[in-house]
Amino acid sequence: MTRFSSCLMVLALSVFTSGQMPAQVISIPEDQVAYEFVGQFNNTPTTSQQFGYISTAKGLSSIFTDNTTQNETTALLTFVTNANTDRVIVNGPFKIINRTGTTTIYLNTPPSDFGDASTFSQGTPIQVSDYSQQVILNTGNNTFVTVHTNNVTQVTTFTLNGKAYRLGRVGNKFRTNYSGEVNAPGLSPSGWFAGNAVGVGAIANSN
C-alpha cells in the first residue's frame, strides 16, 4: 500500500468517526409531558394540514432565538402534520373526525409566519412519525378537542446550542391532546389550537 493510499484511508476513517460522534437522545418519557404545541390548521373536506411550533420540549432548553419573545417568529422547533380524513360521524351537535397522516418536526430557521404555512417546514427534519387522530368538534360553539397517537419512524441527529441531539428514538410513541376553535367557513386559517404530548409505551434503550 502506498503512503498516499494510507493517508486517504486515515482521512476517510477520521471523517467516518467524526460523523458517528454520539448524540444525546432526548427521551419521550412515559406518562410525562414531552412536548407542548402551539398551532393553526387549514382543512379541506378530505385533508388537514396542521402547523406550528413547539413551545416546550422536555430535556431541551433555549428552543427560541429570543427568550423574551417566544412565538412563531423565534421558535427553533416547528412541526407540520399532513393528514387525510378517513371518516366523519355526526352525533347530535358533535362531529367526530378520524384522520391519518405524517407529522414532521423540524429544526427551524426562524422566522416562521402563521400567514405562510410553508415557513414552518423551512428547516431540517429531525423527527418523523406516523399519525392517527380523532377530533370531536362541537358544532354549537365551533370548539373541539382531539386525541392522536404518533409512532416515531425516523430521527436525525441535529445540533442545538453547540450540542448534538436526537429527538427520541424510532419506535417511541406519544399521545397528543389539542384544544382549539374552528374559524368561520371560508376564512384562513381554518382554526387554532394548543396542546401537549405525553409519552406512551416504553422501548429498549437503543438508537
Residue ranges and their predicted role:
Residues 1-7:
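Positively charged n-region of N-terminal signal peptides that target proteins for export
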Residues 7-18:
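Bacterial N-terminal signal peptides
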Residues 20-22:
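Signal peptide processing junction and immediate N-terminal pro/mature segment
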Residues 24-207:
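Extracytosolic secretory-pathway proteins
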